[in-house]
């Protein structure tokens, strides 16, 4: 365990995702060396051996099998965009018993993809916030579905969506382990 994260090699991409749905955002980095760092929830991170020994140059994330856990599509190149002999790989997250809430947002007055929407969930853990983005790192487009890990919590007190148009949607007493299409 370490408060400091030692990212080796030449990092090209990096984003925050909650891979274990414990409510704390983890870090994934790709480049000449890839790494995943699990957020311990106490301002420290632990390195996770998650992939094979071939270092990803690129990746995209999303819930590919709709189980509520973030999966990874790993791309292999020879620095940036030069092709390599290594096939790209999909890693399906095997998950755990932690709970989640997934959101697919579609703008009606706001832009169709809800880019710029600000989402808050409130519960016994406090507040979690996400923003719908069109891109998060160098050369990638991740799934726009927003997934909130809530650990062992079985209920979300409130869900607040602040749409780019200025409209606000609030839902109370939201059940976990579901995907809402709003």
Stretch-by-stretch model annotation:
Residues 4-8, 50-53:
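Surface loop/turn motifs at the tips and blade-to-blade linkers of beta-strand repeat domains
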Residues 11-13:
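Signature of short aromatic-glycine-proline-rich micro-motifs recurring in repeat-based ectodomains
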Residues 21-30, 67-75:
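Acidic/hydrophobic-patterned starts of short beta strands in beta-sheet-rich repeat architectures
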Residues 32-35:
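Loop/turn residues immediately N-terminal
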